[in-house]
Amino acid sequence: MGDPSKQDILTIFKRLRSVPTNKVCFDCGAKNPSWASITYGVFLCIDCSGSHRSLGVHLSFIRSTELDSNWSWFQLRCMQVGGNANASSFFHQHGCSTSDTNAKYNSRAAQLYREKIKSLASQATRKHGTDLWLDSCVVPPLSPPPKEEDFFASHVSPEVSDTAWASAIAEPSSLTSRPVETTLENNEGGQEQGPSVEGLNVPSKAALEVSSIIKKKPNQAKKGLGAKKGSLGAQKLANTCFNEIEKQAQAADKMKEQEDLAKAAPKEESIVSSLRLAYKDLEIQMKKDEKLNISGKKNVDSDRLGMGFGNCRSGISHSVTSDMQTIEQESPIMAKPRKKYNDDSDDSYFTSSSRYFDEAVELRSSSFSSWDDSSDSYWKKETSKDTETILKTTGYSDRPTARRKPDYEPVENTDEAQKKFGNVKAISSDMYFGRQAQADYETRARLERLSASSSISSADLFEEQRKQAAGNYSLSNVLPSAPNMAQFKQGVRSVAGKLSVFANGVVTSIQDRYGS
């Protein structure tokens, strides 16, 4: 037995899906299911087919009715002997009404139905072979054929329908008698009566319309035709004059317009009164400005300074603008920053004094190295230095206004430093600028003096005096020697000179600041 062709598969499923119960999903009731469970012979939607796949093929085998084309005859027979109607009735008979997929298809009823579908499909395959149709595949055996429901028939009871037909039969006579009465009433009313109803005199047309209404919508016969005999649901026209009604409507419109105008008039009057008050305020303000003779520029200045009349809340105002004068600013002369100048000068005094003390320390240190020099030349040098410092600092007018910065001589861009320090790994600024010559000379002198000794200490190398033992004092150690006394005198003299120079500068600055 060969496999069915694609055309056979489409033909079989087209006929199976034409059954009303197979047009919805077996599990959720969604319309137009396109998947099928071969194990139970039911049609499923795509969402429920995913749930069946998670159960496993031993419980439910899923295939597509539109995409899959490799169906076998046994699988087609399972779908033909099954169906949604057969499966739902079988599960209902065995008491399985749960909507949970796992509980439903793992139940005893699902197991029995699987075995039943398998046995019926095997019998149909042996009996019919490759025939497309089975004897019982068109009408499901376990469910009666569905009857199409009529919407109007379900809403209309038999008694009501009989009444509607009886009223429809008796209707033409009432239609013929009704227009005659209306025409008589119209003739008695005169010419100014309502619209004519002469069109209702034709009985044949009215009878046709009534019959068509009854055929299409029998439920409406209950409302219009069965409730009242001899009426179509239209109201009877009264003997009224349409001209009078029109006049009344026009009069009502005129009254409404007059009421609207009466309501709008107070609003317009309030707006006009507010505008008049605003203009009066402006006129009063302009008169005040004219009285005070305020020009445009003064008025702007007074408003800018916060002295305008518009900012005055009370009626009393100060006459500031009457004596207002415009002062033209001339080019200002830059004043000398006296305070800054004096502060800088004071700073220069303090910095100069520190410089003097630094020079004294340098002189003190140099006196040790040049002890062998004559005292006369030493005193001459010191006196010349003191006079130079006095001449430098006594001139107050020649002092700079700003703090003096040290003058650095620019280093010439030559190749001497590169030739001198080319092979050296590290150099200092003193070595680069040549400020280490004196220190190197003193160091070489100490090394030559200690070259004959067998051992030296750091105190001998740096000429540090050793601490003498306690109790080993002599008169020579207590009294200062002649060189120390001379050095002391020279230091006292230099300090006294510096103090006199500093005092002279302070007195001069006080006189310049407070005397003049």
UniProtKB/Swiss-Prot annotation:
Annotated SUPFAM superfamilies: ArfGap/RecO-like zinc finger
A single GO BP: COPI coating of Golgi vesicle
Protein localization: Cytoplasm; Golgi apparatus membrane
InterPro entries, A to Z: ARFGAP/RecO, ArfGAP_dom, ArfGAP_dom_sf
Superkingdom of this protein's organism: Eukaryota
Compositionally biased tracts (Polar residues): 173-194
Entry protein name: ADP-ribosylation factor GTPase-activating protein 3
Organism, scientific name: Macaca fascicularis (Crab-eating macaque)
Record gene name: ARFGAP3
